Design a protein with these regions (language model features):
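The feature captures two recurrent sequence modes
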Residues: 1-163, 279-319
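A contiguous, surface-oriented mixed alpha/beta subdomain in the mid-to-C-terminal portion of proteins
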Residues: 145-211, 215, 223, 227-292
Length: 319
């Protein structure tokens, strides 16, 4: 698997050239297939069954490649709650699962189901659906030339990231918390602030756990690797965020990230970028710390939160 990753043209900033140069955005044949699958979401209502996709052998092969890479990476870099959830709802190794197959595994565990999306979903619909146990997930597969990184969510991201989360009742309750919060918001600005909290926790969160990881390295006291878990003998934070769990490359470089202790007030003031590796991560001390921090901050989160915290719109690089 290392030879595949070594050929992946990721820049120091985490981009695969410019966004337009990524094969997932420049290969016309791939885009035709990707867009045909995405169009299945047109007119789809939350909670309706997702139509079945007849995946090609090439798409199944991409799935197998990523599954083989992530299985070991999760054992080395993922937190215990993630590993336990993955055992509760095993991910098939040999084929891309249909949404119905995923939902059948998840619903008895924590009450969640996949509902169809064609790509990025606006905040109100995406976050709000979580209150009722629905997670918007896509069905297309990332480009086969870059199987270990994708600049947009694909079915691999949704299953290996959010699908694992939603097999855990504790993580699933955090999704519902975001859903309840989103439902009481009216302004796009407030929803955007809420999406930042979601992004840096359930998408890109890490947490400190005692013990060591196979193959992990200790972060330095300055520069990359600073923050919780840094210093000689300290265990680096472990990943729980869905975007990290579905990206082999980002898992392998956790010790090179700037890691800051989780402070939700700081998180909500931090813009994020959708494509490219994240330069800054926020680390909870444990799952209880994450849960308490989110519950406390979101309890009175409303449309005036930005004004109360004196937050100004910060342009985010979401390309």
């Amino acid at each position: 698997m290392s030879h595949v990753w070594s050929r992946t043209p990721v820049t120091r900033e985490g981009r695969l050239g410019t966004a337009a140069q990524h094969p997932g955005r420049s290969d016309s044949l791939y885009l035709k297939r990707r867009n045909a699958i995405a169009r299945l979401a047109r007119g789809h209502r939350v909670g309706e069954p997702s139509p079945a996709v007849e995946y090609t052998e090439a798409e199944h092969a991409t799935w197998r490649t990523v599954h083989g890479a992530l299985a070991g990476a999760h054992r080395a870099y993922a937190c215990r709650e993630v590993l336990d959830a993955a055992e509760a709802a095993p991910i098939p190794a040999d084929h891309v699962p249909q949404h119905a197959e995923v939902s059948e595994r998840l619903k008895p565990l924590a009450g969640f189901e996949f509902t169809l999306a064609g790509g990025f979903v606006e905040n109100r619909r995406f976050l709000g659906a979580m209150e009722n146990g629905y997670f918007h997930a896509v069905q297309f597969v990332r480009h086969p030339l870059v199987p270990l990184y994708t600049p947009e969510p694909d079915v691999i991201h949704d299953v290996f990231g959010h699908g694992i989360h939603l097999a855990s009742p504790r993580f699933a309750e955090l999704y519902r918390l975001f859903g309840r919060t989103a439902r009481r918001l009216e302004t796009p600005e407030a929803l955007d602030l809420l999406s930042r909290v979601y992004w840096f926790t359930l998408e890109f969160g890490v947490m400190t756990e005692t013990g060591s990881r196979t193959g992990s390295r200790t972060g330095s006291r300055t520069g990359p690797g600073t923050g919780p878990g840094s210093g000689p003998g300290a265990a680096p934070p472990k990943a729980y965020g869905a975007a990290l769990l579905s990206s082999y490359g980002e898992l392998a470089r956790l010790d090179r990230c700037e890691v800051r202790e989780l402070d939700v007030h700081a998180v909500v003031a931090t813009p994020y970028r959708v494509s490219g590796y994240q330069p800054v991560l926020f680390s909870a001390r444990c799952l209880n710390h994450l849960t308490d921090s989110l519950a406390g901050f979101l309890a009175d989160f409303d449309d005036d939160t930005g004004d109360r915290l004196d937050l100004r719109p910060v342009p985010g690089d979401r390309s």
